[in-house]
Amino acid sequence: MIDSSIRHRIDPAFNAIGRTLSSMGITANQVTITGFALGMMALPLLAFEMYYSALFMGTLNRVFDALDGAIARDQGITDVGGYLDIVLDFIFYSAVVFGFILAQPEQAVYGAFLIFSFIGSGSSFLAYSIFAEKNNLTTRARGIKSIYYLGGLTEGFETIITFILMCLLPA
């Protein structure tokens, strides 16, 4: 819900950094994969209840996620890059939840419900993007993206705030 309203504030900084990294020969896919690897380090950190360290790795993942898009806009968006970005984001999001489940198995039903909701929203997100592609629907409200999608009640910003609160205030 908030993502499209804050893009004009954060994109200029990320785009400037992205252009610099691009000029150094760094590709968007390299940043995507590196960010994913950093984010996946949060899984064992969460499992061992090292929440601040997990938060740091998760934050790096999100920064790299913003940078890969900025680099892609500079170098040219590719289908492979869009695929990697979406798939690795979904894996990261579910890995964070799984890390919390490993830390507190007695809370697994809540984590299972959250992953269930990710599957539902992720499926509708991807199905709508196929529909939008076939019907030539586009917008730049969320920046230049490899796929088009509608805004939702909760998007990336709200998801990250929730994950931050979960790390800072574990039950």
Where are these regions (language model features)?
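Short juxtamembrane and helix-loop transition motifs at transmembrane-helix boundaries
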Residues: 13-23, 47-48, 71-79, 138-145
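Gly/Ser/Thr-rich beta-alpha loop segments that engage phosphate groups in nucleotides
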Residues: 37, 71, 84, 154-158
